[in-house]
């Protein structure tokens, strides 16, 4: 199955997510209601990725699935959702357990394991195509991350004053027990939560002064 340029848009109210191309190679076992994917590839301005895995079709009584549950393994990912970054951010790969409901559209991720520079970011959440637009609710956690990588992954348009202060005033820090949350509702600015523990902090404490360690 090969598709040219198009967009994911569950309804007229949702902002379309465009893609340049997509393709998939798969086999289907109707007795088990299972699809085995040897390849799923997507190229778009939001990102590029290649995956493999399997999916189980649910609610086939009408001859068309109401939902599917899937487990996928994803190779290297280059991501830039909604143009949040100056260029694509590259990750080593990922694995995911997910459920896709078609009407109304809802993508639920039970466990998304994103590998990045020897660490693993675990995400879960749901994206819904509502009658008034996209709704997103995502939570994540990570054991540790280098502070410079945190700033690379923190979009400059989200909490820009906090991000700038950290970038300009934190000279060194060891981060652990990172928690992340993103909530988005139609017509409202996204709400970002970031929590973490830290040690070995070194920071500027006045505009023209020295530094303090903690």
Model-derived regions: residue spans:
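Extended amphipathic, helix-rich lipid-handling scaffolds
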Residues: 1-48, 54-112, 137-208
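Short, T/G/N/S-enriched strand-turn elements that build extracellular solenoid repeat scaffolds
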Residues: 53-54, 125
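Internal alpha-helical scaffold/solenoid segments in large eukaryotic proteins
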Residues: 116-119
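Extended, hydrophobic alpha-helical segments in both membrane/secreted and soluble proteins
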Residues: 121-123, 210-214
């Amino acid at each position: 199955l090969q598709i040219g340029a198009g967009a994911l848009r569950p309804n007229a109210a949702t902002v379309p997510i465009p893609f340049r191309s997509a393709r998939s190679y798969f086999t289907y076992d109707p007795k088990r209601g299972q699809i085995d994917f040897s390849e799923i590839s997507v190229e778009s301005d939001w990102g590029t990725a290649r995956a493999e895995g399997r999916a189980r079709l649910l609610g086939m009584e009408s001859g068309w699935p109401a939902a599917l549950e899937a487990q996928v393994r994803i190779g290297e990912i280059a991501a830039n959702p909604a143009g949040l970054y100056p260029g694509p951010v590259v990750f080593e790969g990922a694995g995911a357990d997910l459920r896709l409901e078609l009407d109304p559209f809802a993508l639920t991720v039970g466990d998304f394991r994103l590998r990045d520079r020897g660490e693993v970011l675990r995400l879960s959440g749901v994206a819904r195509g509502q009658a008034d637009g996209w709704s997103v609710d995502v939570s994540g956690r990570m054991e540790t991350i280098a502070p410079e990588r945190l700033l690379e992954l923190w979009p400059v348009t989200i909490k820009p004053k906090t991000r700038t202060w950290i970038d300009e005033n934190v000279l060194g820090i060891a981060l652990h027990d990172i928690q992340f949350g993103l909530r988005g509702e139609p017509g409202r600015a996204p709400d970002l939560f970031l929590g973490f523990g830290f040690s070995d902090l070194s920071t500027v404490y006045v505009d023209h002064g020295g530094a303090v360690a903690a």
